[in-house]
């Protein structure tokens, strides 16, 4: 993978993100201060946003434009992360359950075969 293909590579400055999304730089700083979007920092301490974070900021800006407070937006993002984690856990459990069902079916076939002998 080339570095520019990495969605999580911190590439963009506050000014670049503000220009891309047509938001104020102060808005981006507030998102960081309130823990809504926490970009990486350069060695010099400047905020650097990945493409993933830019996408999140775009979403956050839409929610803020709709009248949501930063505290409410942070909670929405937290809940969405919890949903993703729970969905991943559910998928793992379903896979384990399917594997167990396959083992049980194989054992049942073996028992039927052994009883038929």
Tell where the protein language model's regions lie, with residue ranges.
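Beta-hairpin "wing" of winged helix-turn-helix
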Residues: 38-44
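Minor-groove-contacting beta-hairpin "wing" of winged helix-turn-helix DNA-binding domains
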Residues: 45-51
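Arg/Lys-rich, alpha-helical DNA-contact motif
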Residues: 1-10, 19, 33, 51-117
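Short coil turns linking two alpha-helices in DNA-binding domains
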Residues: 24-27
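Alpha-helical DNA-recognition elements
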Residues: 30, 34-36
